[in-house]
Amino acid sequence: MASGSSKAVIKNADMSEEMQADAVDCATQALEKYNIEKDIAAYIKKEFDRKHNPTWHCIVGRNFGSYVTHETKHFIYFYLGQVAILLFKSG
């Protein structure tokens, strides 16, 4: 699902600037590696579980609504090109 050099557009975030940058970098890598949304989400989730301790949840897609409970300072919703990424920690 190569997004070329798509710019990240952060729509909503409750997360440190450093962690936001990490989320965008991680998502960029995932989009370069995988074509299937489920695989992209799994890659991001596993990376964040490893780097920032479990339990992270990730949703990737072009069209979805959401309403989630998350831990303070552990939420980001952003676009890379046409693809939306919701990443949050809960549990």
Swiss-Prot record:
SUPFAM superfamilies referenced in this protein's UniProt entry, alphabetically: DLC
InterPro entries given in the database record: DLC_sf, Dynein_light_1/2_CS, Dynein_light_chain_typ-1/2
Compartments where located: Cytoplasm, Cytoskeleton, Flagellum axoneme
Predominant location: cytoplasm
Annotated CDD domains: DLC-like_DYNLL1_DYNLL2
BP GO annotations: microtubule-based process; motile cilium assembly
Gene3D superfamilies according to UniProt: Protein Inhibitor Of Neuronal Nitric Oxide Synthase
Domain of life, per lineage: Eukaryota
Keyword list, A-Z: Cell projection, Cilium, Cytoplasm, Cytoskeleton, Dynein, Flagellum, Microtubule, Motor protein
Subunit annotation: Consists of at least 3 heavy chains (alpha, beta and gamma), 2 intermediate chains and 8 light chains.
Family: Belongs to the dynein light chain family.
Name listed for the protein in its UniProt record: Dynein 8 kDa light chain, flagellar outer arm
Annotated source species: Chlamydomonas reinhardtii
Source organism phylogeny: Eukaryota, Viridiplantae, Chlorophyta, core chlorophytes, Chlorophyceae
